[in-house]
A protein has these predicted regions:
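Post-Walker A helix-loop "phosphate-sensing" segment adjacent to the P-loop in P-loop NTPases
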Residues: 30-39
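Conserved phosphate-donor/acceptor-positioning beta-strand/loop module used by diverse small-molecule
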Residues: 102-107, 116-141
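Post-Walker A alpha-helix
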Residues: 25-26
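P-loop (Walker A) phosphate-binding loop of NTP-binding proteins
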Residues: 15-17
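NTP-dependent small-molecule kinase module
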Residues: 143-144, 158-200
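Extreme N-terminal, non-catalytic leader segments
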Residues: 1-11, 34
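ATP-dependent small-molecule kinase phosphotransfer cores
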Residues: 43-102, 108-112
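Conserved lysine of the Walker
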Residues: 22
Length: 200
């Protein structure tokens, strides 16, 4: 078999401002039965209404998270808006062993860290149609104070400046179309010549 025919699993990193719709996109892909592994991020923040332990996030105490961080159990971890978030390394390596592509949802800072650790990772930025629309979505969530809303909006403006570091951008103006584009990116990367080879 030609070396290019031996496909290695891809590490696809989905990033973008808070409230842009990353979770909605991944949930739709799950419902549609996408043949990828969706990592579940560990966090120290409080669980929100309708979130499920082990499905939306792995909720840990500060102490437990620190233990795992000290053992180097995370592919990447960072303090975001006062809470720790980390991608469990074991989830990624186990999925790779099964030949599955891996989708990681992470903040822009974390995406840059993963790209340094795994230069062959595929970085996808999800952008809002406008900052005004992003602010509207954050207000609709009813989880943010005015102070938090202002901070997240300003952070989003700064994060948009990192777009050139990404491989793809999806403007999430309509959920179905945004999901279709993400599915197409994953499919296209599977056909890439030469294939990406991710080493962790």
């Amino acid at each position: 078999m030609h070396p290019y025919m031996r496909r290695s699993p891809n590490l696809v990193v989905l990033s973008g401002p808070s409230g842009v719709g990353k979770d909605a996109m991944l949930n739709r892909m799950r419902l549609d039965g996408a043949s990828v592994h969706f990592t579940v991020t560990a966090t120290t923040r409080q669980i929100r209404v309708n979130e499920r332990e082990g499905i939306d996030y792995i909720f840990l105490s500060q102490e437990k998270f620190a233990e795992k961080r000290d053992r180097n159990d995370f592919l990447e971890c960072a303090l975001v808006y006062g809470n720790w978030y980390g991608v469990p390394k074991r989830q990624v390596t186990d999925a790779f062993d099964r030949g599955l592509d891996v989708l990681v949802k992470i903040d822009v800072q974390g995406a840059a860290t993963i790209k340094r650790l795994a230069p062959q990772a595929v970085l996808v930025f999800v952008a809002p149609p406008s900052i005004h629309e992003l602010e509207r979505r954050l207000r609709w969530r009813l989880t943010e104070s005015e102070e938090s809303l202002a901070l997240r909006t300003e952070t989003a403006r700064r994060e948009m400046e990192h777009l050139p570091a990404f491989d793809y951008v999806i403007v999430n103006d309509a959920l179905e179309e945004a999901v279709r584009q993400l599915v197409c990116i994953v499919a296209a990367e599977r056909c890439r010549i030469p294939p990406r080879v991710v080493r962790l």
